[in-house]
UniProtKB/Swiss-Prot annotation:
Species name: Thermosynechococcus vestitus (strain NIES-2133 / IAM M-273 / BP-1)
Summary of subunit composition and partner proteins: Part of the 50S ribosomal subunit.
Gene: rpmE
Protein name according to UniProt: Large ribosomal subunit protein bL31
Role played: Binds the 23S rRNA.
Family: Belongs to the bacterial ribosomal protein bL31 family. Type A subfamily.
Species lineage: Bacteria, Bacillati, Cyanobacteriota, Cyanophyceae, Acaryochloridales
């Protein structure tokens, strides 16, 4: 027999909310769950292309790499683009 009063309360009909709408009910230790994304509005399942950026990571990446310049060598000259050596094939 389990010890009394050590387990959290179980809510068999906990409501899951997304954008203020109840989307499903599940069993949980919390009476309500709030989610930003679920299968009904996820870009993979809906077929739409949408950037999900909850914390500004995309903007930070774009700011960081938007003004990039070609890397320079130690002497201050621009690095030459790498090219593969050409081979002459006869026959």
């Amino acid at each position: 027999m389990p010890k009394p009063n050590i387990h959290p309360q179980w809510y068999p009909e906990a409501k899951v909310y997304c954008d203020g709408e109840v989307i499903m009910t599940v069993g949980s230790t919390k009476p309500e769950l709030h989610v930003d994304i679920w299968s009904g509005n996820h870009p993979f399942f809906t077929g739409t292309q949408k950037i999900v950026d909850a914390e500004g990571r995309v903007e930070r990446f774009r700011r960081k790499y938007s003004g990039t310049k070609p890397q320079q060598t130690a002497k201050g000259k621009k690095a030459a683009p790498k090219s593969t050596p050409k081979t002459n094939k006869k026959g």
